[in-house]
């Protein structure tokens, strides 16, 4: 796993009270199932690991994630959408660092979150109350009811990020595509 992602998962998130369980990408389905905890909220991986260059068995990880009622989130930065389309193999959410291949020259800092709209958050309301219950900070909107499965996660991620970051220094450089 990319060093920045590893440090975020093992150090920063730990300080915030979030525990992350790491698994070997070559583990058996049984070992993978054993890594899940009752409070597991998501499974995260990279389509091609950086710097190891190992290719993730997306179908195996998607099947495990879905058996345990969590979305599979994949970082597809290294592979890019030209070489790998994770949704076709079962991923629910795909993230990209657009600063790399998509920008080409690292002239702009950016990222993308792409939601397949297929994960049913409403089947697990206790696990995902931020999407399935009214959000007081946005006039009581319930994201899954208002935006459906295809828009709930990405809308919440976008509006809360914009709210929490505050005014954008150069708004012409921020884009919201839904």
Stretches with model-predicted labels:
Residues 1-178:
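Conserved PLP-enzyme active-site core in the AAT-like
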């Amino acid at each position: 796993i990319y060093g920045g992602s590893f440090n975020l998962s093992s150090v920063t998130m730990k300080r915030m009270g979030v525990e992350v369980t790491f698994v070997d990408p070559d583990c058996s389905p049984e070992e993978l199932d054993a890594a899940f905890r009752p409070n597991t909220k998501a499974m995260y991986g990279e389509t091609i690991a950086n710097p190891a260059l190992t290719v993730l068995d997306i179908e195996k990880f998607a099947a495990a994630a879905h058996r345990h009622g969590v979305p599979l989130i994949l970082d597809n930065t290294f592979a890019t959408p030209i070489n790998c389309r994770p949704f076709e193999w079962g991923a629910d959410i795909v993230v990209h660092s657009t600063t790399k291949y998509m920008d080409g020259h690292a002239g702009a800092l950016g990222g993308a979150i792409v939601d397949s709209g297929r994960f049913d958050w409403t089947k697990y309301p206790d696990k995902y109350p931020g999407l399935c219950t009214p959000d007081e900070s946005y006039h009581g909107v319930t994201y899954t009811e208002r935006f459906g499965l295809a828009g709930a996660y990405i809308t919440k991620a976008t509006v809360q990020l914009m709210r929490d970051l505050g005014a954008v220094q150069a708004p012409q450089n921020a884009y919201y595509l839904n």
